Amino acid sequence: MKITLPAPAKINLYLDVLGKRPDGYHNIKSVMQTVDLCDEITVEMLTPTPGLQSIQISCSEAALPCDARNLAHRAAVAFFNGCNIYDFTCRIDIQKNIPMAAGLAGGSTDAAAVLRGLNALSGHPLDTDALCSLGAAIGA
């Protein structure tokens, strides 16, 4: 089973950094707007091999890491751990249209699309609040 989802870019119309938190991140106040520019994320669940945890990432942008450094990979790990799924095999294909390091949330939106895709393919075990909590835990 597989699903393809858009991962829209966003721009900050207003951003105020309020202070550093104990976890090293900053509290912010922002107003943002999605734009028409999107990455395209395809998530595919494959038949798992007992005892195997496999996340395979491919990307149209050669400079993007396709391993645990990628937020899409971290999102998949967070999803499977959050659902107590310990045997899994999935493929994630990232068609990059959002420029890297442009401040348009390309990595974050890709991770969010992976969470939404895995949740849909798994029969929606997590509600929106749980998905948001996983996303917040992944980082930026």
Q: Where in this protein do the model-derived segments appear?
A:
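Short, small-residue alpha-helix embedded
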Residues: S108-S122
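ATP-binding N-lobe of GHMP and related small-molecule kinases
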Residues: M1-A102, A120, H124-D129, I138
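Extracytoplasmic/periplasmic copper-protein system
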Residues: C132
